[in-house]
């Protein structure tokens, strides 16, 4: 018989002191409070990441939370079974359906889409997508990070796991004097991160020390066992790997570069390390390879490095927000090497004749020289430049290493995979509980976006790469913003601005026509008609633009593009447009900006084309017009420097030219006159609606 006995109570034949039950109740209450607080912080992180409803649908289609059917469980054992094994085996996830219906500003984030947003196709995803979604993370210079930063990084990794993204982290302790010290530091930092993960609510770490092996016949290490990696990842553990490899011949341990460890993990999880039998049926080989790729999806490559995102030394931008690797990798790599060489030149003693003059001509250090060096005497300048020159050179080497690593890894992965470089401090600051971020005297504002959570939900950078810097608002107080990278797509630009800059008196530009054999005119016409959902009068359009083309930009296989022209203001006779006094008044005009419907709102195609237009082709500015009811206008508005409604018409005019109309009213009048005068070339001849 069960009943109270004095201050004790009897349960299942035993007597438990009442004091113990009180302590158990208090402990469970504290646990529930901790879980409630963790849930609150988790959802605050999601909300502050500001994903749109469309992004939420896309996330849910990639990371469906599907429960597998289970055999019926006897009623008497059902509760016990669920208690013991439910949490361990369930797929992590979160119901975001109604969560994203709350914020108007979130729902109205502009996306380049010229038609109604299609419903997200989730039929394939529901129940069919059983791939393990993995993020490979490189934590650089872990020894230099304080405990608070490590804890913030650990919390974010735990939140990624909860959102369905398993993480495998390579811990790089940083530069060390010798091999033994380096391996010891690597183990210590791996333990430090593992302990921080275990301390998070729901966080579980699994440290792997013997996962890498090295063969004398190849430089790159490989993974000793695929299942050693996959088992803990499937059980919702965050795998922590030390970049130490063991020799297959001698079993001797040696350090390997963390970038090599990341490459080895990428190759293994991408299914590229399977030994190929030359006698095997090719169809069997293809089936096995496809099965390996379906088993694991390496969705993200994450580099957490104190040097931050990739800086930009050319153009108005200070950093690369988005990198289209197919188009930009070689140029950015050369840009970083050029910056490093410029530092080394003026640090060299042979350049000391006029150190300040040489330095101020070099973009990467001009600010430092202007503020710190120039005010000093000549004798004081050189030691300061030498000391900081070494630091800047080391930082640039870090940027080059990160860029090369992501280029090599993204090449091995599907085009849908992406990468992000950000600082551990930015991740940690945005992961901290909200009340810790504000002091008593501060005013509460919107919580800082967590770059990793935002990137997972949206597969985009924190802000669009084609936004002018003044429209990006106040971002994190970091000197090195995040960089988002994708394999992307190649760009075809005619004429090539690196060889012949686009100019109204450029001979190449005058002779370029849309009949050029380098241009696939039928595909270009299809791109325009698909994007605008209108039939083009091709011959009328060709007769209008041929002879005045500034250039053409094509993204990928005609997935997006822009046609730009040099237009003549109406008060200049057409036959006089090329006279020297009139050339300066020719208007750079965006005649067509088109993206295939299937590529609108995703993949960054519109941003890739727009960036090429305003940064590479026409950095001095360009104007265009758009119907007043065009849903793309919000997207245009954010990327332009000005907009103007053309009274008496259904047109709005946009431009990216600086200081217009304030300092150049004539140019503004020419822009307006051109935008009013151009006649459309649609086959339906419905110019009235325009």
Swiss-Prot record:
Region (Disordered): 62-93
Catalytic activity field: L-glutamate + acetyl-CoA = N-acetyl-L-glutamate + CoA + H(+)
Biased composition (Polar residues): 75-84
Organism of derivation: Talaromyces stipitatus (strain ATCC 10500 / CBS 375.48 / QM 6759 / NRRL 1006) (Penicillium stipitatum)
Gene Ontology CC annotation, any one: mitochondrial matrix
GO process terms (BP): L-arginine biosynthetic process; ornithine biosynthetic process
Protein name: Amino-acid acetyltransferase, mitochondrial
Protein family (similarity comment): Belongs to the acetyltransferase family.
Entry GO MF terms: L-glutamate N-acetyltransferase activity
Function: N-acetylglutamate synthase involved in arginine biosynthesis.
Signal peptide per UniProt: none
EC number, as in UniProt: 2.3.1.1
Compartmental location: Mitochondrion
PROSITE patterns associated with the record: GNAT_NAGS (PS51731)
Involved pathway(s): Amino-acid biosynthesis; L-arginine biosynthesis; N(2)-acetyl-L-ornithine from L-glutamate: step 1/4
Swiss-Prot/TrEMBL keywords: Acyltransferase, Amino-acid biosynthesis, Mitochondrion, Transferase, Transit peptide
Gene3D superfamilies in the record: 3.40.630.30, Acetylglutamate kinase-like
N-acetyltransferase domain sequence ranges: 508-679
A Pfam family annotated for this UniProt entry: NAT
């Amino acid at each position: 018989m069960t009943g109270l006995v004095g201050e004790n109570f009897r349960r299942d034949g035993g007597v438990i002191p009442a004091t113990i039950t009180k302590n158990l109740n208090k402990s469970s209450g504290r646990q529930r409070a901790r879980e409630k607080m963790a849930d609150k912080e988790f959802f605050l992180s999601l909300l502050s990441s500001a994903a749109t409803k469309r992004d939420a649908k896309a996330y849910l289609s990639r990371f469906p939370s599907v429960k597998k059917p289970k055999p019926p469980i006897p009623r008497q054992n059902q509760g016990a079974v669920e208690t013991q094994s439910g949490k361990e085996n369930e797929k992590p996830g979160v119901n975001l359906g109604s969560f994203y219906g709350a914020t108007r500003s979130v729902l109205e984030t502009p996306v380049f889409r010229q038609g109604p947003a299609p419903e997200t196709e989730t039929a394939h995803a529901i129940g069919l997508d059983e791939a393990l979604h993995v993020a490979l993370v490189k934590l650089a210079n872990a020894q230099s990070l304080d405990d608070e930063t490590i804890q913030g990084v650990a919390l974010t990794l735990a939140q990624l796991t909860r959102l369905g993204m398993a993480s495998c982290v390579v811990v790089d302790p940083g530069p060390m004097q010798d091999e033994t010290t380096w391996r010891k530091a690597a183990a210590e930092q791996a333990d430090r991160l593992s302990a921080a993960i275990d301390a998070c609510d729901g966080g579980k770490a699994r440290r792997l020390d013997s996962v890498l092996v090295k063969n004398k016949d190849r430089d790159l290490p490989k993974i000793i066992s695929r299942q050693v990696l996959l088992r803990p990842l499937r059980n919702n553990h965050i795998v922590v790997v030390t970049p130490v490899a063991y020799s297959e011949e001698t079993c001797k341990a040696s350090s390997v570069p963390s970038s090599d460890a990341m490459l080895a993990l990428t190759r293994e999880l991408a299914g590229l390390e399977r030994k190929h039998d030359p006698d095997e049926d090719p169809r069997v080989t293809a089936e096995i390879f496809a099965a390996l790729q379906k088993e694991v999806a390496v969705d993200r490559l994450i580099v957490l490095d104190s040097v931050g995102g990739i800086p930009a030394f050319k153009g108005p931008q200070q950093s690369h927000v988005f990198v289209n690797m197919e188009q930009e990798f070689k140029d950015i790599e050369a840009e970083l090497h050029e910056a490093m060489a410029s530092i080394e030149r003026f640090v060299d003693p042979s350049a000391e004749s006029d150190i300040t003059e040489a330095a101020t001509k070099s973009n990467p250090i001009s600010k430092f020289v202007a503020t710190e060096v120039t005010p000093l005497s000549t004798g004081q300048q050189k030691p300061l430049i030498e000391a900081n020159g070494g630091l800047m050179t080391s930082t640039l080497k870090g940027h080059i290493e990160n860029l090369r690593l992501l280029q090599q890894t993204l090449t091995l992965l599907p085009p849908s995979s992406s990468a992000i470089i950000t600082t551990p401090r930015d991740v940690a600051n945005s992961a901290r509980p909200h009340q810790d971020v504000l002091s008593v005297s501060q005013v509460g504002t919107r919580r800082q976006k967590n770059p990793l959570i935002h990137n997972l939900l949206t597969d985009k950078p924190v802000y669009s790469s084609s936004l002018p810097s003044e429209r990006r608002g106040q971002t994190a107080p970091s000197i090195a913003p995040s960089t988002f990278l994708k394999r992307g797509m190649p760009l075809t630009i005619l004429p090539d601005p690196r060889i012949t800059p686009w100019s109204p008196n450029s001979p190449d530009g005058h002779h370029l026509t849309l009949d050029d054999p380098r241009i696939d005119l039928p595909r270009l016409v299809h791109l325009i008609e698909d994007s605008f959902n209108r039939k083009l009068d091709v011959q009328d359009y060709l007769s209008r633009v041929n002879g005045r083309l500034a250039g053409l930009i094509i993204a990928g296989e005609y997935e997006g593009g822009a046609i730009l022209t040099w237009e003549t203001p109406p008060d200049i006779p057409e036959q006089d447009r090329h006279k020297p006094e009139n050339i300066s008044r020719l208007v750079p005009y965006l005649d067509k900006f088109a993206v295939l419907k299937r590529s609108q709102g995703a993949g960054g195609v519109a941003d890739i084309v727009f960036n090429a237009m305003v940064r590479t082709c026409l950095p001095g500015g360009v104007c265009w017009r758009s119907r007043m009811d065009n849903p793309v206008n919000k997207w245009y508005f954010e990327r332009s420097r000005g907009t103007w409604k053309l009274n008496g018409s259904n047109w709005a005019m946009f431009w990216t030219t600086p200081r217009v109309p304030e300092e150049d009213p004539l140019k503004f009048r020419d822009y307006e006159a051109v935008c009013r005068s151009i006649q459309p070339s649609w086959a339906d001849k419905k110019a009235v609606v325009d």
